[in-house]
Amino acid sequence: MVSLHPLLDNGITPGSDSFPGGTLKCLCPSFPVEITLTTNVAHNHACGCSKCWKPAGALFSIVGVVPRDELSVTANGDKLAIVDESAVIQRYACKECGTHLYRRIEKEHPFYGLDFVHAELSEEEGWQEPQFAAFVSSVIEQGFDPAKIGEVRARFRELGLETYDSLSPPLMDAIAAWTGRKNGKYDLHSWLDCERRKGGGGGGQPGGVVCRL
């Protein structure tokens, strides 16, 4: 059986709609960088792109988003550095262990206002479980045997996750709507018109944030 990620290989553990957030730490054995999230992640998913941080041996990363004002660096932030300052999505990584703590967008972008994080770096339980798999075919570009990509998609389906070679349809629709609004095609709320949710809810967005068109 193909190995995807430690959080997926033994089955998916459901998260909690009422989970309030927690702390994420880098992998340094002493003085780790720590960030604190005051809400659960949303749109958590497996990602096959070459940019996302993955634990050793993992084929996919697991990444979700939180509003940027729900994230703060709470310990040893002096160890953080931006991996590529020219990139639209700036990745803040520990200079010692290389772990990516969060990604932030400072330029005009459909997802401006959201930070990307890896909830697996937390010891708390209750984070939203993965909802889908994105950029699946991208692992081929990184050296994965194309003859075995069908096994990868089949394994995701066994786990109950739909596979895409881009982001999920709701997120792709959001990008298209943002672009249409930017081009003056219609007057539309930004997809990042995010509201705090009082209590939990379904739809893949539990624990605090609602993003809508």
Swiss-Prot record:
Residue span(s) of domain CENP-V/GFA: 19-165
Catalytic reactions on record: S-(hydroxymethyl)glutathione = glutathione + formaldehyde
Organism per entry: Podospora anserina (strain S / ATCC MYA-4624 / DSM 980 / FGSC 10383)
UniProt cross-references to PANTHER family, sorted A to Z: CENP-V_GFA DOMAIN-CONTAINING PROTEIN-RELATED, GFA DOMAIN-CONTAINING PROTEIN
InterPro entries in alphabetical order: CENP-V/GFA, Formald_GSH, Mss4-like_sf
Essential cofactor(s): Zn(2+)
Primary role: Catalyzes the condensation of formaldehyde and glutathione to S-hydroxymethylglutathione.
Residues the entry annotates as binding Zn(2+) 1: C26, C28, C94, C97
Record note on cofactor: Binds 2 Zn(2+) ions per subunit.
Keywords from the named record: Lyase, Metal-binding, Zinc
PROSITE patterns: CENP_V_GFA
EC number, UniProt record: 4.4.1.22
Domain of life according to the entry: Eukaryota
Disulfide-bond pairs as recorded: none
Name listed for the protein in its UniProt record: Putative glutathione-dependent formaldehyde-activating enzyme
Any GO molecular function: S-(hydroxymethyl)glutathione synthase activity
Similarity remark: Belongs to the Gfa family.
Binding site for Zn(2+) 2: C47, C49, C52
Keyword Disulfide bond on entry: no
Database matches in NCBIfam families: formald_GSH (TIGR02820), PRK05417.1 (NF003829)
Biological-process GO terms, alphabetical: formaldehyde catabolic process
Enzyme class name: lyase
Pathway assignment: One-carbon metabolism; formaldehyde degradation; formate from formaldehyde (glutathione route): step 1/3
